[in-house]
């Protein structure tokens, strides 16, 4: 009886764990649908800024960044939460060992980067799409400080992207490094001095591009989480089935023993 009781307790606990896992999977699935809408909008914003920059640089090519910067920093975007497989491990393996200053984002990733000699800053990451603006409000000033303090004018982002195997390395700063290919039309009528306008444009581009990258990373993270949880739920269900079979077997044995006791009692009464 005690063995079957222990099995039933384990079954109840596993059932509760399974419900939690299914809830986590459903939340991740809902997040991917929301992020899909965000990505469509943000992707259009980035394209519009890039088109405006290309058009502007046709008339002000002296402001463009055609010379690669001497120093680069790395922005590594990992996961704030777990249950996403080797998401963070792949990012750590992608670090090139060049000694470039590293900005890490995501609690789970940052816990692995704490003792890295090149770390220049560690930040909590977003768990849902609505957290991204708050994360960027802390991150962008750190990028600016790194540019001023260590003269790192280049910034490369390491992150995951859905449908792409491995880690994506995206050069983000300096922006607009490709020479314009369009033909000049009419010069812009600006209310700002061209250099000031271009600086503001770069600032807006940095925020827009980082929004898109973070949404992309969150999408990949949640897809990994769904896949990871599906595998865990399947293994849990298999374990449940195995324990349920054992519990039924023990119950059948108990019933058999009870029948034998009853039969022995009946035989004793008859013999008297």
What label would you give each PLM region?
Residues 1-272:
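N-terminal assembly/interaction segments in proteins that build large macromolecular machines
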